[in-house]
UniProtKB/Swiss-Prot annotation:
Class of this enzyme: ligase
Statement: the UniProt record of this protein carries the keyword Protein biosynthesis: yes
Free-text cofactor note: Binds 1 zinc ion per subunit.
GO biological process, one term: methionyl-tRNA aminoacylation
Protein name: Methionine--tRNA ligase
Subcellular location: Cytoplasm
Family recorded in the similarity comment: Belongs to the class-I aminoacyl-tRNA synthetase family. MetG type 2A subfamily.
UniProt GO MF annotations: ATP binding; metal ion binding; methionine-tRNA ligase activity
Role played: Is required not only for elongation of protein synthesis but also for the initiation of all mRNA translation through initiator tRNA(fMet) aminoacylation.
'HIGH' region (motif): residue ranges: 11-21
Gene symbol of the encoding locus: metG
């Protein structure tokens, strides 16, 4: 059976979830649902990264112990994912005892292979990013995304990359890691590999909130090493859990492992993580999806200090669950930084959901109710203009899958928007209200059947995003189980008997 293991990065539990967390997690949820629609068995992992100096410092400033602090923040994440209808299979926490034991096991394995050695770390450290810097601006003392750097000099255990430099360089130069968009691979090569890949310090001495080194409890394992291994600790890799071979370490050609990440953490996931896996003899993920930054309407990166952050709560209050999921997925592209504002999302909501998809479904429902008493049986379409619309529905399905399989979600959606536009245009041309007066019920039924077909195609394909509205539409038109299924979508004969619900509830109310 085809399988797909989808992961988000585990989010740093130093505060509440923000719009970037919401986008990545919605994207993972939509991919999971889409894969399941297409016959895959899918497993979706998300969670929280809970160790490190930043957590410890923030907890202390609030008069809390670190565990209490992260417990509070984890609850915010779990509640938000519930509100957004995120259907994950496992929520991992790096404070889980099983995770900690398995991270120590991985560390010990690498040490036993002679890949970890004692030396001294000297350079700059960003507490906010939990990241070391060999090179940095000595004037500003800011990291690459603007956080304050601290000079550090301390003994540390390092992992040797000398036998992996050429390997990872070739993997990235030829994009054998399958990084999307491909421009991210070029960024990694230019920014991190061309100048030489330094060995990585894997431990800190003065951080107590973390996982101790298994053979030296005076040192704590680097938070990024700890965090990256969540993708296989949740599968019980160190315990011979069958889940590890099922979802990760197998040779099935139809098996996919997709890591969703944001641009600023691509280096850790696409350089260090593949090296660790390679050194341990484990398989690599099959796909890395690295989306750009989320910026405000003026192109500025969102940050609390600039006061331009949009919270998921604001989006939910304005657009509801389906509206929030749709606006984020429609607007966000993987190949660029994405401008976001409440005004931009409002325009998308009104144009796409209220005026296009919602209006088409409501209009189709209303015409069948008014002109045909709410009943419509399957009919062979003969009229050339209506047949052209039916053909366009079939083409939209193919184009949608092509786009989504290439993670170009907006392209697939735009094809469906074009479909309902053409349906609206045909309604205005054929004037069903005139067909009734002329008692031309043959053409009327063909037109309305094609409109139902367009409704079916749009809302079956959009069901991974519009989880509530799609079901509402299916119920309004009394679609059979087969008519609601992607498996049978290519066959319009699944629409054998349309019997409308008594009344239609508002779908997407236009926002002023």
């Amino acid at each position: 059976m085809k399988r797909c293991y989808i992961t988000t990065p585990i989010y740093y539990a130093s505060g509440k979830p923000h719009i970037g967390h919401a986008f990545t997690t919605i994207l993972a949820d939509v991919i999971k649902r889409y894969k399941q629609q297409n016959g895959y068995e899918a497993y979706f992992l998300t969670g929280t990264d809970e160790h490190g100096n930043k957590i410890e410092s923030k907890a202390k400033s609030l008069g809390l112990d670190p565990q209490t602090f992260v417990d509070q923040n984890v609850a915010y994440f779990q509640q938000m994912w519930k509100q957004l209808d995120i259907n994950f299979d496992h929520f991992i926490r790096t404070t889980d005892l099983s995770h900690k034991a398995q991270v120590q096991h991985a560390f010990q394995l690498l040490y036993d292979k002679g890949l970890i050695y004692q030396s001294n770390w000297e350079g700059a450290y960003c507490v906010e990013c939990e990241q070391n810097y060999f090179t940095y601006d000595k004037q500003t003392m800011l990291c690459e995304i603007g956080h304050q750097l601290t000079l550090v000099q301390e003994p540390s255990l390092f992992i040797a990359f000398k036998d992996s430099k050429d390997w990872i360089g070739e993997m990235i130069a030829t994009n054998k890691l399958n990084i999307t968009p491909e421009s991210r691979a070029a960024e990694l090569k230019n920014n991190f590999l061309d100048g030489g890949l330094n060995d990585l310090a894997l431990t800190r001495q003065n951080v107590t909130w973390g996982i101790p080194v298994p053979f030296d409890n005076k040192q704590t394992i680097y938070v990024w090493f700890d965090a990256l291994f969540n993708y296989i600790t949740n599968l019980g890799f160190a315990h011979n859990d069958p889940k590890f071979n099922k979802w990760w370490n197998n040779n099935d050609e139809e098996h996919e492992v997709i890591h969703l990440i944001s641009r600023e953490i691509t280096r850790f996931h696409c350089i260090y993580w593949p090296i660790f896996l390679h050194q341990l003899g484990f398989k690599l993920p099959t796909q890395f999806l690295s989306h750009g930054w989320i910026v405000d309407g003026n192109g500025h990166k969102m940050s609390k200090s600039l006061g331009n952050v949009i919270s998921p709560e604001e989006l939910l209050a304005q657009f509801g669950v389906d509206g929030t999921r749709y606006c984020l997925l429609k607007e966000m592209r993987l190949d660029k930084d994405n401008r976001c504002s409440m005004a931009i999302f409002k325009d998308i909501y009104n144009a796409d959901l209220a005026n296009s998809f919602g209006n088409h479904a409501s209009r189709t429902f209303g015409m069948i109710k008014k002109y045909l008493g709410g009943q419509l049986d399957f009919i062979e379409v003969q009229d050339p203009q209506v047949k052209q619309l039916m053909d366009q529905a079939n083409q939209a399905m193919v184009q949608f899958d092509t786009a989504w399989n290439n993670f170009q979600f907006y392209k697939g959606i735009n094809g469906l928007l074009q479909l309902v536009f053409q349906a609206s245009k045909l309604i205005d041309q054929l004037k069903p209200w005139e067909l009734v007066k002329q008692t031309d019920y043959t053409l009327l039924k063909q037109l309305l059947f094609a409109c139902v077909r367009c409704t079916q195609v749009c809302f079956v394909l959009l069901a991974p995003i519009l989880v509530h509205t799609s079901t509402q539409i299916f119920d309004l038109f009394n679609f059979s189980a087969q008519a609601r299924s992607k498996t049978h979508l290519a066959d319009p004969q699944q629409l054998q008997k349309i019997s409308l619900a008594p009344v239609i509830q508002p779908l997407f109310k236009r926002l002023d």
